[in-house]
Amino acid sequence: RTRGHLARVERARSILRTAVEIAGGVEAVAVFTSWGSDSVPLCDLAMTTLGPVTMVHMASAYEMPGGERVVEHFAARGRVVDIPPSRTLDETVAWLHDIGLGCDRESESAKKITNRAKGDKGAQWAADNGVAVQVLGMRADETLTRRALFAARGPVYRSRGLTIACPLASWSTVDVWAYAVSRGLPWHPLYDCEGLGFTRENLSNIGWLTTHGVTSGRLAWLRRYYPDLHTRITEEWPHLRGLG
């Protein structure tokens, strides 16, 4: 591991300690996790820096299957809370037929609507449970919007009446995987499904009904590694067959 990587790890720990100071105690801090590649080092850093912490997962009706080993690993080390999905799978399918799939809508506005809904739901849970600081796994190099956010406000900022702390703000995907591998941490098996131009560094555990970026080959990847899920989505929306 390079000196730069180690410096970013220490910076992440410093941000976590700042979060506890702002919250007035670790009991008022919650780590929000998707159980994706960024969440693995995020949760491990939080527990090795702060001790047992509350990890909050906003469940989805269409999550990629197979992530149980990750959840079990962290549940054995801290408290895991699942916020149930707002819709069942059938309700989600009906809703998507009504509003259109993500790939059939204007991409950025559709993403903003989804992100805003998730943020509101997380903020409401925090308010209802005495949480003053949300720890998120966002990184600046993921999108131009996030890069601009961190450039303007830093990795710790106020939003929706809460303090948001982002320990991985300066990390790259190389940092994420270097940390996970060096610590011997488990990850979702989908990240081992490398092929068709996808690697661990650019794979994502977005739900299988999420079709943003479908033209980049995600649907073809789904067909190769998760054929049953590919069949389900293309039977529901036949026009997707031409995209993978």
PLM segments and residue spans:
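Nucleotide-activated chemistry modules centered on ATP-dependent adenylation/adenylyltransferase
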Residues: 1-244
